[in-house]
Amino acid sequence: MKSTDSAKCLGSKSLAICCLLLHLLLCIRPAVSQTQSPQRYLHNVDSNSNNNERLHQILKGSGAGSGATQLNWPQPPKQTVPNVKTELAKLNNTYVYQNAWPANNVKLGAVTAVSFDKAGNVVIFHRVNRVWGQTTFDNRNQYQEKYRGPIRESTILALEPATGKVQYDWGKNFFYMPHGLTVDPEDNVWLTDVAMHQVFKFPPRGGDGKPALTLGDAFQPGSGRKFCKPTSVAVLDNGDFFVADGYCNARILKYSRKGELILFWGQNTFSGISYDVAPQNFFAIPHALTLVPELQLLCAADRENGRVQCFLSSNGTFHSQYHNQLIGDRLFSMAYTPAAGGQLVIVNGPTAELGIHPEHYNEVHGFVLSMRSKQLVSKFGPNNLQFQNPHDVAVTADGNEIYVAELNPMRIHKFVHRSLAKPMSLSASKDSRDSAISQAVGGDQVPAVAVHHPSGKAILVASLMLLFAGSTFALALIFARRRKRGCLPFGARGRRHAWEKSDGFKLGGLLDRDRNGFEKLDQQASDEEQETKTLASAQYA
């Protein structure tokens, strides 16, 4: 009897457990079905449907009415923001800086452009003693220093690529504010002068000093068939050419070999509708041009948008763009080489903020970007350090040599691919110069050096002195850190720091700010907007 009761009890418990499991199963299945049944996206709507139909569909799927389910919009992929400093440190330095190039007797002003002639010489354009300052142009882009006359010295120099010696020079008594230089396949030299608002074509090596073709009206800025501070020229094999009308008009123009206008395109990022991200064909100073013959492309350095835009050279149709967060928001110039499947060699620029701590971390380098992957391959700089104000760049067709024109310091830099050159340190360069000096003054005699062996007492005294100096330095460092953090009862707790900036101290704050993501840029803004302690000391280009 007892065993029968136990069996009944066990059977009842088993039945209860089975019922509970069945109940849970019935509850779970509808829940799973409910989460899977609603469609994640809206139904396709015919492109001819009107806006009312689209609005009705959105309302129908967004919870209006009973029984409607919540619509889950597809979210754009989240982009991780890289640590710029860390990622830059990972990039390889594939080019070696040539300290001893050019020759010591080459005297330069601000170097604005660099190209190659048919003989392989490095041809540069420089401003000698002219500086683009705050008062160089008025608010109407009129040049204010015409009274000084043209630059008296040669503004174009051709340097031998191996030795850096001057092979020939020209361009005296003609230019006022040099900017762009391009040597075309026929060895003609194309130049732009931002003060004169003109574009010039000269015969090889300058000919007799007179331009074979002149576009624009001297010292008369404008639009239409006039220019306003043109920046660069690129020339096709058939003689047709492009002009970047950069600082004011933000456009690119294509001309026939004879100088007849074929077409033009481009809109100014700093006028009209405000955009968070600049659309295609918009420019914030098209600053340099380069050709990609294999793809029949013309590429432009969109300076203040920090990108390269490429277009079909036949009709100006947008093709592609290249940008990388490690380059930053300012991209001054680029040059193309077919090496390694096609690469762009790029130089960026310093932050446009003057006299304050930059809002975003920025390093000024040369970069090599693969056009296939759109990824940075390597970086380079003088002695693997940063540039200050690079303005233009040129690269040989084989990609083995790179030349960078810099405004300040006023230099032309040479880099050679590491597979072809041995690195030479600054100390080695200094030693070689010191050796040359010693040979000049007295030959190769090496002075005798007396070797002194310190005693144990001297070593003890020196050790105590070093220990005292080290402890003093450590205390001073701790004191300085605590004072900076405000841990001391006195000091700089109430002082305003440079990074606690306000709009009043920012260059952009001096201009109108009415767009999201971009600051209005003064169309007179120069290339040489380097970080300085005060606005008054800032140079322009």
From Swiss-Prot:
Annotated SUPFAM superfamilies: Calcium-dependent phosphotriesterase
Signal peptide: 1-33
Membrane topology of this protein: Single-pass type I membrane protein
Entry's localization field: Cell membrane
The NHL repeat ranges on this chain: 164-205, 215-258, 272-314, 374-418
One example GO MF annotation: metal ion binding
Catalytic activity, reaction form: a [peptide]-C-terminal (2S)-2-hydroxyglycine = a [peptide]-C-terminal amide + glyoxylate
Membrane-traversing stretches: 459-479
PTM comment, free text: N-glycosylated.
GO cellular component: extracellular region; neuronal cell body; plasma membrane
Single GO biological process annotation from the record: peptide metabolic process
InterPro entries cross-referenced by the UniProt entry: 6-blade_b-propeller_TolB-like, NHL_repeat, PHM/PAL
Glycosylation sites: 92, 315
Cofactor: Zn(2+)
Disulfide bond positions: 228-248, 299-310
Sequence ranges on the Extracellular membrane side: 34-458
E.C. number: 4.3.2.5
Segments on the Cytoplasmic face: 480-541
Region (Disordered): 521-541
UniProt family annotation: Belongs to the peptidyl-alpha-hydroxyglycine alpha-amidating lyase family.
Reported function: Peptidyl-alpha-hydroxylglycine alpha-amidating lyase that catalyzes an essential reaction in C-terminal alpha-amidation of peptides. Mediates the dismutation of the unstable peptidyl(2-hydroxyglycine) intermediate to glyoxylate and the corresponding desglycine peptide amide. C-terminal amidation of peptides such as neuropeptides is essential for full biological activity.
Protein name, per record: Peptidyl-alpha-hydroxyglycine alpha-amidating lyase 1
Biological source species: Drosophila melanogaster
